[in-house]
């Protein structure tokens, strides 16, 4: 997706109010599978088969993304992908995601709508449900995602289990996102593949669990 500037003539999030904004983000979300109670109450409730694995990830505008490099849809997808990848690296199955968004009150509602669409798209790709979150105002856009994952009766596969002489296996592409940052930083938009790797990373969902079930002694998200 090619980023475009926000439509500053559109309504701003400060004009629609927090509850209306939350309604736009969560419209149509329900509860299924391990999620017994999703958005709309003080807490979400999940039923798990094993131990709970939890990880959180924060993205700050100007540090982890730039709006002239990434569209709102891209930012939403990246927020989910970066967080869920950590659960995958423990051999856990992601089941729930809590997401908080802080943004300037002057930001167009259109940006939040596109961001939410990206979050939903990546949640669907990852097989995880958005179960809650928070919104507030801030000078810059800050997105924090927390993933809740089920180990399903298996022990967590930590970084500490690696031993000399073991086989090292890699799933996914190494260095492409960093190459994308370097390309964009020089004012270019191609090679497109590495630019997209920065804007919208695509973790190999399911590979972490498969590795854990196959007996991997160590896992890490890099």
Give a label for each model feature.
Residues 1-222:
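Helix-biased detector of long, well-ordered alpha-helical tracts
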